[in-house]
Structure formats: structure tokens, C-alpha cells
């Protein structure tokens, strides 16, 4: 199942500097990557975490591929110049599908991407109908269709691309209520089906943040599947076997690309996730 938001009583795990720990960057265009970070942190609580989100170019789902690749490389480079990294997680499905080759060519540390959890969903479905809920960019990309052909060719795949759901997830973290009517409208093609998907892949890292609302709207018993736990396990393996010795004793920190009022409003949320401060990251280009 998708991960749930932490409640307000979650302790700040890195409130004070401690012994040097491996430094891991988790990056997304927005705050959806916090769902992936949360899975990694639960498995690996004793790391030095950096969360970076690109609130200047958000959302990536509507941007062209060349722009995304250049932008992601610039941001990871800027973080690496401040904190030598043991590993980076691109916690954005859109960015992962286009930028991983460039990142892995440029940097010596491991880079982990996020891909839609098509394979486990194909194993879990009972009625053979799997829904893929993602951004329009992820739904259209050939990489997604290759995953389906490879791992779910015996399933009926129903795809929905939505930029509005990304905005709903961002708004939720800003303290706004999520409109169930808006979700029903987005999901209407599935809700009208005689036999809708019994398993839904959350193919955007923002969407686990809407798990509770999605379960209220989708038919009872619908399974929600995301790749957060698998990314956490992959991160643990790479840190043990392939990551360079890049450590820091600093507190966990979050970076935005522009310190807007909206970004400042996220500080209490980020602190609940264990990040002590939010700073603007200077990015060249």
C-alpha cells in the first residue's frame, strides 16, 4: 500500500548534528518525493538526508525532455558542490524516465530512479485489470509502455494522466483540504467501467500523499501500489556495496530553488519529516 503522511507528532530525527553519516540526496520537482524519502528513512534512519525540490520549474510532467535533463543535472551538481553525496534518489517518475543516463554518466555516486510499479501490480491483480495513475508525460513516454509490455502483457492496463492530482497533493501539504469531487472527476473513466481496475499503480511520487482520499473514491478493496519500499531497499543495497564514503555530521536540510512564500509555508511540514531548515539553492544556468 502507499505510505501515509506522518502526523504532527513525528520527532525531528536530525534536530542536532551527530556523528558523520552517509549523505543521501532525495530530489523531486515538488514535495511528492517526500513519500519516497519517508520509505527510505524508515528503513535507513541514520543517514544524513538532503531533500531538494524544484519549485521554479514545477511541475516537470508538462516540460520537454531536454529541459528536464539539463535542469536535473544542474540541481544535483549544485547540491554535490555543497555536500559530497554518497547516493542520489531522483524521486520523480518524469525526471527518472529521461535524466538517469545523464546523471550516471556525470557522477561517480549511485543514482536511483523511480519507475511505475507495473511489475508488482501485475502480480497482485485478481481481475487482470491494472490502473496506472500518473502524469500525462509518464503515461505517454515509451519507457512506460515498454514496462507494460515486459511485465504486464497479460493484463488489461487502463492509464490515466493527470497534472491536477499533482497540484492537489501539493495543496494538501500546504494544509488545504483535498476535494473528493475533484478526484471523482479525474477518476471518472475508471469509476464508469463495468469492471474497474482492482489494482492501481501510483505512477507519480505525489500520489501516495493522496492515498487516504483515493481509497475513499475508488471501489472498495482497490489496492494501491507504489515503488517507495523497493526504492528504499535498492538504496540500502547500493549504500552497502557501491556508494563512495561521503559523510556529513550536519543536520538534515531541505533546499528549494526559490524562497517564495509558498515554499516558506512548507517548513513546518519539512520539519515533521526530519529536516531542520529550508534554504534556497543557488543553481547555475
Curated annotation (Swiss-Prot):
<comment type="pathway">
    <text>Cell wall biogenesis; peptidoglycan biosynthesis.</text>
</comment>
<feature type="binding site">
    <location>
        <begin position="60"/>
        <end position="61"/>
    </location>
    <ligand>
        <name>substrate</name>
    </ligand>
</feature>
<keyword id="KW-0961">Cell wall biogenesis/degradation</keyword>
<keyword id="KW-0573">Peptidoglycan synthesis</keyword>
<keyword id="KW-0413">Isomerase</keyword>
<feature type="active site" description="Proton donor/acceptor">
    <location>
        <position position="204"/>
    </location>
</feature>
<feature type="binding site">
    <location>
        <begin position="205"/>
        <end position="206"/>
    </location>
    <ligand>
        <name>substrate</name>
    </ligand>
</feature>
<protein>
    <recommendedName>
        <fullName>Glutamate racemase</fullName>
        <ecNumber>5.1.1.3</ecNumber>
    </recommendedName>
</protein>
<keyword id="KW-0133">Cell shape</keyword>
<dbReference type="InterPro" id="IPR001920">
    <property type="entry name" value="Asp/Glu_race"/>
</dbReference>
<dbReference type="InterPro" id="IPR004391">
    <property type="entry name" value="Glu_race"/>
</dbReference>
<feature type="binding site">
    <location>
        <begin position="28"/>
        <end position="29"/>
    </location>
    <ligand>
        <name>substrate</name>
    </ligand>
</feature>
<dbReference type="InterPro" id="IPR033134">
    <property type="entry name" value="Asp/Glu_racemase_AS_2"/>
</dbReference>
<comment type="similarity">
    <text>Belongs to the aspartate/glutamate racemases family.</text>
</comment>
<dbReference type="GO" id="GO:0071555">
    <property type="term" value="P:cell wall organization"/>
</dbReference>
<dbReference type="InterPro" id="IPR018187">
    <property type="entry name" value="Asp/Glu_racemase_AS_1"/>
</dbReference>
<dbReference type="GO" id="GO:0009252">
    <property type="term" value="P:peptidoglycan biosynthetic process"/>
</dbReference>
<comment type="function">
    <text>Provides the (R)-glutamate required for cell wall biosynthesis.</text>
</comment>
<dbReference type="GO" id="GO:0008360">
    <property type="term" value="P:regulation of cell shape"/>
</dbReference>
<feature type="binding site">
    <location>
        <begin position="93"/>
        <end position="94"/>
    </location>
    <ligand>
        <name>substrate</name>
    </ligand>
</feature>
<dbReference type="InterPro" id="IPR015942">
    <property type="entry name" value="Asp/Glu/hydantoin_racemase"/>
</dbReference>
<dbReference type="Pfam" id="PF01177">
    <property type="entry name" value="Asp_Glu_race"/>
</dbReference>
<dbReference type="GO" id="GO:0008881">
    <property type="term" value="F:glutamate racemase activity"/>
</dbReference>
<feature type="active site" description="Proton donor/acceptor">
    <location>
        <position position="92"/>
    </location>
</feature>
Amino acid at each position: 500500500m502507499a505510505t501515509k503522511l506522518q502526523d504532527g507528532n513525528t520527532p525531528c530525527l536530525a534536530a542536532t548534528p551527530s556523528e558523520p553519516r552517509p549523505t543521501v540526496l532525495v530530489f523531486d520537482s515538488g514535495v511528492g518525493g517526500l513519500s519516497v524519502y519517508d520509505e527510505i528513512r524508515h528503513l535507513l534512519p541514520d543517514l544524513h538526508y538532503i531533500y531538494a525540490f524544484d519549485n521554479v520549474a514545477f511541475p516537470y510532467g508538462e516540460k520537454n525532455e531536454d529541459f528536464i535533463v539539463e535542469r536535473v543535472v544542474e540541481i544535483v551538481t549544485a547540491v554535490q558542490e555543497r555536500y559530497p553525496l554518497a547516493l542520489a534518489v531522483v524521486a520523480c517518475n518524469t525526471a527518472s524516465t529521461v535524466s538517469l543516463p545523464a546523471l550516471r554518466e556525470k557522477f561517480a555516486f549511485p543514482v536511483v530512479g523511480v519507475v511505475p510499479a507495473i511489475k508488482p501490480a501485475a502480480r497482485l491483480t485478481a481481475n487482470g485489470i491494472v490502473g496506472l495513475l500518473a502524469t500525462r508525460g509518464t503515461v505517454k513516454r515509451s519507457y512506460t509502455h515498454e514496462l507494460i509490455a515486459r511485465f504486464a502483457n497479460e493484463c488489461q492496463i487502463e492509464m490515466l494522466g493527470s497534472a491536477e492530482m499533482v497540484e492537489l497533493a501539493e495543496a494538501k501539504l500546504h494544509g488545504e483540504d483535498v476535494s473528493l469531487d475533484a478526484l471523482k472527476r479525474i477518476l471518472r473513466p475508471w469509476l464508469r467501467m463495468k469492471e474497474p481496475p482492482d489494482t492501481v499503480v501510483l505512477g507519480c511520487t505525489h500520489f501516495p500523499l493522496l492515498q487516504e482520499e483515493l481509497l475513499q473514491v475508488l471501489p472498495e478493496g482497490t489496492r494501491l501500489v507504489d515503488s517507495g519500499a523497493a526504492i528504499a531497499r535498492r538504496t540500502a543495497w547500493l549504500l552497502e556495496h557501491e556508494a563512495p564514503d561521503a559523510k556529513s555530521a550536519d543536520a538534515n536540510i531541505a533546499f528549494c530553488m526559490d524562497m517564495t512564500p509558498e515554499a516558506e509555508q512548507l517548513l513546518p511540514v519539512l520539519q515533521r519529516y526530519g529536516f531542520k531548515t529550508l534554504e534556497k539553492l543557488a543553481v547555475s544556468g
